[in-house]
Amino acid sequence: MKTTWNYSRRLLPFFLCMLLSVFGNNAQTLPFRLSKGAGTFRLGVVCGNESCWLDQCSVKKKGQAYTIKDKLWKEGEIKLIVCPLTDSNGFIMEVSGERLPEEFKLCWAFGACDGADDSAVTDNSIPVASCFHNVFSIEGNAFTTYYGESMKLRTVHGVSPIGSEIRLSDGHKQASPLALFNSGKKTDAPVISALYPWKPQEKLYFCFYQRADYNY
């Protein structure tokens, strides 16, 4: 059994690369919005006392891959690879970086689940109007978002890098990643935000997916 597990573990990076190499034409713009109103995922970075959202930086998109540059990390670049899931509303994301500064942190945020049909969004923030009735359950590096009417409750699940410091935050305060992370949980528009101490050359993985409606 141990030999089989070791063999499977060696093959895991190969299968991940295969999974992340398909569906290239389905990649979307930042921030990442799940269809059917199932939530918005926003990424940012923190360097010292400064922070910025990746959707406010220079973004070059090619298929399912994104290359992001900004003066905050000088000559470095951040790369995203996104793969939509085939059996659920969701996606897997790989985040990597090159020539990034020391003491660099990744910030991420998620919210705005309302089940509404896709509609035009006027800016890059997590839509506050869709956050009012979201309830979050956080367990380690994973979370579940509950939303919708009581008899038609829906869920969205997320898995983030182990070591993410996840907390409830105020969706009204998205001026910067640090502003959101330090905003506090007393709000009528809850979202979750997190900081992760990003090590040089480390690849990070996220997964967001939606299951069937909740049944009582």
Indicate where each model-derived feature is located.
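Bacterial N-terminal signal peptides that target proteins for export
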Residues: 2-13
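Bacterial N-terminal signal peptides
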Residues: 13-21
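An extended acidic
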Residues: 25-72, 146-170
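Short beta-strand/loop motifs in extracellular/secreted proteins, especially
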Residues: 39-41, 102-106, 204
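Surface-exposed coil/turn segments at beta-strand junctions on protein surfaces, enriched
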Residues: 61, 73, 86, 187, ...
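Low-complexity, acidic Ser/Thr/Pro/Gly-rich terminal tails and inter-domain linkers that flank the onset
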Residues: 68-85
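Polysaccharide-binding surfaces and accessory modules of carbohydrate-active proteins
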Residues: 83-174
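Beta-strand-rich recognition/accessory modules
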Residues: 164-216
